[in-house]
């Protein structure tokens, strides 16, 4: 009997040793491949922001500048927004910024507060030599940063056109659950990379209208391996409650043109979604809400419609 227990113990230790070796190899492989892949697939231009590298993509020309700002945890905002940016660039200068922790940008230890993120946006635009005022086009959580930006630097924000953006008061009703920092090990040990390559690919609807090329979808996949659950993104997740609380009951400035494009799916899923955005409006002559059929990532399915609505909105309010 003792021999059997010893044998079982040895087998168990052997399995643990194999698992440890696999995890170590996975982590080493991931951290070797990550900079190689980033260099291979890099798109746009790199600017220095607070001593770190931030990636940006600038396209088009025109009297108006639209700045596209991504949702929380988007693997590569440049890839994510590319079809929309290409369409907008026919009439406008378009800038896509990849926050720290996203896409090809570095990680950062700076707190993911409204103040810091907005200052990084401003510094990046200055480094790109792109002058304002800007039309901010935020998706999801970037609606919070855009509101903060407009309130604190009104001369730099000409308008906001939101894509199913977060609203400050939503966390009064539904707090974000904190994410433990040790989850970043999932990223640094390459487990997200392993998952993306070993498990079947699930269709999240990103390419529902074939906006993206095969190469772009490939880059998005590797960017997911780089960035999912990294420490910077986790820090940003854990700042959502504080960042929204800072703007509780705040409304848009009365003289700021705003168009909130809401996703029909989100409105149907959350009874309060429309109300939360109506609460922000102070001037119905300049500020409006439009509901588009589709999911939270409206630019995956409605790029042409967003461009059409944007052109009408700018023509009416900003010319």
Question: What are these language model-derived features?
Answer:
Residues 212-283:
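Conserved serine/cysteine hydrolase catalytic core
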Residues 166-198:
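A catalytic-pocket lid/entrance helix-loop region that shapes and gates access to the active site
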Residues 52-104:
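Conserved HGGG/HGGXW glycine-rich cap/lid loop of the alpha/beta-hydrolase fold
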């Amino acid at each position: 009997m003792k021999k059997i227990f010893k044998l079982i113990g040895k087998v168990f230790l052997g399995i643990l040793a194999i698992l440890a070796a696999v995890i170590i190899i996975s982590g080493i492989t991931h951290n070797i491949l990550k900079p190689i892949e980033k260099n291979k697939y890099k798109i746009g231009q790199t600017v220095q922001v607070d001593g770190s590298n931030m990636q940006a993509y600038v396209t088009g020309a025109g009297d108006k500048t639209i700045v596209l700002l991504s949702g929380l945890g988007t693997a590569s905002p440049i890839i994510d927004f590319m079809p929309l940016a290409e369409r907008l660039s026919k009439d406008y200068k378009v800038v896509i910024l990849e926050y720290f922790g996203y896409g090809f940008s570095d990680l950062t230890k700076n707190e993911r507060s409204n103040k810091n993120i907005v200052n990084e946006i401003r510094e990046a635009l200055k480094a790109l030599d792109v002058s304002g005022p800007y039309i901010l086009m935020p998706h999801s959580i970037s609606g919070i940063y855009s509101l903060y930006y407009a309130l604190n630097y009104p001369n730099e924000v000409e308008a906001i056109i939101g894509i199913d953006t977060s609203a400050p008061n939503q966390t009064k009703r539904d707090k974000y659950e904190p994410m433990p920092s040790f989850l970043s090990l999932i990223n640094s040990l390459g487990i997200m990379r392993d998952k993306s390559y070993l498990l079947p690919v699930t269709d999240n609807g990103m390419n529902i209208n074939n906006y993206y090329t095969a190469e772009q979808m490939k880059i998005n996949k590797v960017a997911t391996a780089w960035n999912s659950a990294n420490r910077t993104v986790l820090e940003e997740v854990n700042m959502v409650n504080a960042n929204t609380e800072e703007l509780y009951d705040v409304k848009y400035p009365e003289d700021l043109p705003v168009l909130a494009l809401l996703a029909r799916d989100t409105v149907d899923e959350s009874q309060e979604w429309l109300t939360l955005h109506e609460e922000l409006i102070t001037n119905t002559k300049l500020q409006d809400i439009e509901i588009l059929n589709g999911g939270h990532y409206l630019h995956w399915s409605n790029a042409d419609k967003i461009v059409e609505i944007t052109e009408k909105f700018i023509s009416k309010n900003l010319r």
